[in-house]
């Protein structure tokens, strides 16, 4: 197996890690509810779950 001949310095290690960074999440605003949410994710608003502008689950109604 390969192993390093020399210890990697803190500077070299940190320079390499500058490219490892988190991206900023894109946030959408629903045209129906006006709620801010992540793209491609369902979200709750006033007891209803919305996805792509449509109600998917409605918890406000009683299930008989």
Swiss-Prot record:
One of the protein's GO biological processes: translation
Top-level taxon in the UniProt lineage: Bacteria
Gene Ontology molecular function: structural constituent of ribosome
GO CC terms: large ribosomal subunit
Entry keywords, A to Z: Ribonucleoprotein, Ribosomal protein
Alphabetical list of InterPro entries matching this protein: Ribosomal_bL32, Ribosomal_bL32_bact, Ribosomal_zn-bd
Keyword Ribonucleoprotein: yes
Family statement drawn from the similarity comment of this UniProt entry: Belongs to the bacterial ribosomal protein bL32 family.
Protein's recorded name: Large ribosomal subunit protein bL32
Organism from which the protein derives: Flavobacterium johnsoniae (strain ATCC 17061 / DSM 2064 / JCM 8514 / BCRC 14874 / CCUG 350202 / NBRC 14942 / NCIMB 11054 / UW101) (Cytophaga johnsonae)
Gene transcribed to yield this protein: rpmF
């Amino acid at each position: 197996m390969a192993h390093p001949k020399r210890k990697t310095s803190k500077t070299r290690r940190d320079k390499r890690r500058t490219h490892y960074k988190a991206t900023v999440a894109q946030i959408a605003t629903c045209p129906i509810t006006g709620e801010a949410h992540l793209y491609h994710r369902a979200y709750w608003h006033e007891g209803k779950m919305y996805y792509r502008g449509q109600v998917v689950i409605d918890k406000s109604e009683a299930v008989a």
